[in-house]
Amino acid sequence: MQTTFTELMQQLFLKLGLNHQVNENDVYTFEVDGHIQVLIACYHQQWVQLFSELGADLPTNDNLFGEHWPAHVQGRLDGKSILWSQQSLVGLDIDEMQAWLERFIDDIEQRKEPQNTKFQPNSTSPILFI
């Protein structure tokens, strides 16, 4: 028997030890450390969708078919950068859902990391000047 979206979300939040928060449109809210918010919804009871607002100052990215599957797509909505992803509800189990959500959150954290802090040489790092 196929798991419904509501059952999948209840299992996910139970497994993570969290109270599930859902609004009237069946959109679940998942918060990480108070600085990342992921919205989880299901489109036409067929496509599970993850969505997060990245902020206004992030450069666009072309990761349409990047390193993740399902793909994490960065775009713009109402003047803000967003990240979204979707995959079929059919065959999606609790472990796959959790792994997908974790990869999505990791991707958000990497994209929100300031560009100037990605590489900071220390005193032992060899630096080549030409």
From Swiss-Prot:
Keyword set, alphabetical order: Chaperone, Plasmid
GO biological process: protein secretion by the type III secretion system
Disulfides per UniProt: none
Chaperone keyword on record: yes
Entry keyword Iron: no
Job of this protein: Functions as a specific chaperone for YopT.
Subunit structure: Binds to YopT.
The name this protein goes by in its record: Chaperone protein SycT
Species annotation: Yersinia enterocolitica
Gene expressing this chain: sycT
